[in-house]
Amino acid sequence: MIEVVAELSRGPVFLAGEALECVVTVTNPLPPTATSASSEALAWASAQIHCQFHASESRVALPPPDSSQPDVQPESQTVLLPHRGERGQCILSTPPKILFCDLRLDPGESKSYSYSEVLPVEGPPSFRGQSVKYVYKLTIGCQRVNSPITLLRVPLRVLVLTGLQDVRFPQDEAVAPSSPFLEEDEGGKKDSWLTELAGERLMAATSCRSLHLYNISDGRGKVGTFGIFKSVYRLGEDVVGTLNLGEGTVACLQYSVSLQTEERVQPEYQRRRGAGGAPSVSHITHARHQESCLHTTRTSFSLPIPLSSTPGFCTAIVSLKWRLHFEFVTSREPGLVLLPPVEQPEPATWTGPEQVPVDTFSWDLPIKPEASHTFLSVQPASYCYSVRSHIRAI
């Protein structure tokens, strides 16, 4: 039996354009109760990164596959199929890299190999939605002599930061170490430069604070004013807003605000509803705040953006957008007063009305979450992610 261990030193979360580094260790373990063991021979091992795409048949109408594409890969490529046995289509893959060939391990012996690859910037981010799924994996294929190929898959999470797709890595002199006594390899320079640039762009986009005011009105008058300081946020940050109802001419009885994502299938890929298709637009609520606000002049809310969520993006098949979805319940009666009178001629019991005629309306405000600094500042020594696989003899 051969044991293969893949270890990511800095965790499974990466930025598109960043270099992934993985250490693959191949071991021929020595059984503790075995009296004798033989050496094991491995023909080869290869690794590559691929993005698997899967669409819901009830929501997305994909064109038929191209029959002109051959089912068998040409002899010039490796026989490794990273997406073998998985649902969907492989829409993006890096060139395979050979880790070793003709490896023989004695009992108890192990060998380690380093794999490095830059994550493509032209691909979509990792996403699991109602209509489509984009899943990234690092696949390591290993084959024993005269045995089938065994695959080891390491799940990855890839984030895309707006504006980095067109950035080119500068020349060596532009990213030289600040100290002449420090040495840094080419991959480390590029990785640190990209992380620093992403952090600067993210800070510039999310640190700008300017109060934006929105008048909220229905068909009968003004309900209130909503205030928010910015529209670009980081994953894990709180969306804070204030609502001023004291200036309104229409009484607001209750309001709710939801932090939602809108997943919309592009028109050319939408499945017709008459053919048994599901809606082409789906909404997911990540956080919600509800409050009864009669006689409330000013209130506020705070909604956290989950770290596990995906920032907005757009592909040829689907788009994802974020929004604040407001729902207001207002009174139809002008000048509604539900307080007891201040002066009572004699002791009496006051009760509120059993029924109040109301109207409801909604309002959507787009916002834009971006990748978080939490993912851009993970230190190699603080996180270790490993996956194990066993290759057994026939």
Swiss-Prot record:
The keyword Cytoplasm applies. Its main location: cytoplasm. One of its GO terms (molecular function) is guanyl-nucleotide exchange factor activity. Keywords: Cytoplasm, Guanine-nucleotide releasing factor, Membrane. One of its GO terms (cellular component) is protein-containing complex. It is found in: Cytoplasm, Cytosol; Membrane. It comes from the Eukaryota. Pfam families: Rgp1 (PF08737). GO terms for biological process: negative regulation of protein catabolic process; positive regulation of GTPase activity; retrograde transport, endosome to Golgi. Forms a complex with RIC1; the interaction enhances RAB6A GTPase activity. Interacts with RIC1. Interacts with RAB6A; the interaction is direct with a preference for RAB6A-GDP. Interacts with RAB33B. The RIC1-RGP1 complex acts as a guanine nucleotide exchange factor (GEF), which activates RAB6A by exchanging bound GDP for free GTP and may thereby required for efficient fusion of endosome-derived vesicles with the Golgi compartment. The RIC1-RGP1 complex participates in the recycling of mannose-6-phosphate receptors. Belongs to the RGP1 family. This is RAB6A-GEF complex partner protein 2. It comes from Bos taurus.
